[in-house]
């Protein structure tokens, strides 16, 4: 059974999308494409893995950061994990509260991510923020948000290192 906070967060992002239209039309659904030899997927929130265990079209892969869901590139919106529903954004949990940022990893595949949050529907951004606030109230989900924050900080630091400057989310 999914944690209540996760059920509520998923519900908030069930219908709303980054653009008023299908953003996959902009890039050919680049975020849902897999490439031979690569096991790319989405990091699941605590409790989500059970939804996909044994489901056709989905593979669960353990990683040092948690469970990654790899799909075949097509699924119904109702079956998408929370990370897909909020893509290309990421929820961060800083000492001063919840923050919403463009996922540093998304910039490699998503033209909207390269544009930043201002290119997205502000209703979508607000819904992601509301979902993050719900998750931050749950200890297990808050710990996951802190891990996501650390991962984003590492990606930003690595990028800054190669650009020769210090950068923060």
Located regions from the model:
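Short loop/turn segments that flank or connect secondary-structure elements
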Residues: 1-169
């Amino acid at each position: 059974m999914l944690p209540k906070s996760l059920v509520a967060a998923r519900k908030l992002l069930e219908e709303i999308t980054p653009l008023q239209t299908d953003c996959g039309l902009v890039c050919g659904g680049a975020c849902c494409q897999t490439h031979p030899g690569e096991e790319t997927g989405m990091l699941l929130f605590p409790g989500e893995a059970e939804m996909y265990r044994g489901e056709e079209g989905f593979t669960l892969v353990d990683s040092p950061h948690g469970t990654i869901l790899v799909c075949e590139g097509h699924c119904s919106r109702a079956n998408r994990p929370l990370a897909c529903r909020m893509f290309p954004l990421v929820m961060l949990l800083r000492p001063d509260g919840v923050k919403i940022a463009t996922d540093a990893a998304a910039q490699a595949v998503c033209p909207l991510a390269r544009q930043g949050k201002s290119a997205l529907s502000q209703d979508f951004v607000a819904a992601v923020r509301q979902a993050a606030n719900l998750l931050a109230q749950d200890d297990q989900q808050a710990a996951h948000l802190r891990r996501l924050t650390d991962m984003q900080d590492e990606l930003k630091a690595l990028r800054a290192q190669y650009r020769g400057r210090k950068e923060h989310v």
